[in-house]
């Protein structure tokens, strides 16, 4: 993986400036983000803006993300992703190279952003996720930080109508997933994925809960939050 410090700084500055001009971004509980050490940042995904927000908000120089290879077709987008050392991922089949690069980044103390849902939700509510995030947390032995983002659904379009959308980015506390038992690996990865998604959902409005609306773990987290 190649690093381009100057290009990264330029990209972060320009994108940060554009976002501040086009939208009002409210950041909540950023102090939950460690200033050192590797961890996985997991977000809900309703817009291409979601991973960009994570990149410009977290105050570290080693933040990057997994990005679908289909976006390589856009020369400008490819240049931006390469500038921030993004990891290109083939979502159509197992991508051993991307997984290895992601694990090395995390084990070397870097920060990796990923959307467990794997693709954008068209209506803003949570959709069935994939187990990739839970798998990465398992093989890299790093904690997970859930992030809930609201306001980006159609937010870019509203921005260009001179209506600055209100975007909220809320960072949850880091947590560690339980080890995966090899004898029931698939089931454990699903359970760990549900844990990630329920922690994200617990920070989202009810209208965003989607497929997790009736999940027992989400209800448990919401009750605990009410008591605190």
Give short role names for the model-derived ranges.
Residues 27, 65, 86-88, 144, ...:
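Conserved beta-strand scaffold positions in the cores of enzyme catalytic domains, especially
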Residues 14-16, 83-89, 116-120:
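Short, basic, glycine/proline-bearing loop/turn elements
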Residues 20, 33-93, 101:
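Catalytic core of membrane glycerolipid acyltransferases/transacylases, capturing the structured
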Residues 1-7, 97-228:
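Non-catalytic C-terminal accessory region of glycerolipid acyltransferases
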Residues 20-28, 150-153:
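Short gly/ser/thr-rich secondary-structure transition/capping motifs
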Residues 4-23, 78, 82:
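Short hydrophobic helices that act as membrane-entry/anchoring signals
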Residues 11, 15, 51, 64, ...:
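A general structural signal for well-ordered alpha-helical segments in protein cores
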Residues 30, 44, 68, 92, ...:
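Generic beta-structure capping elements
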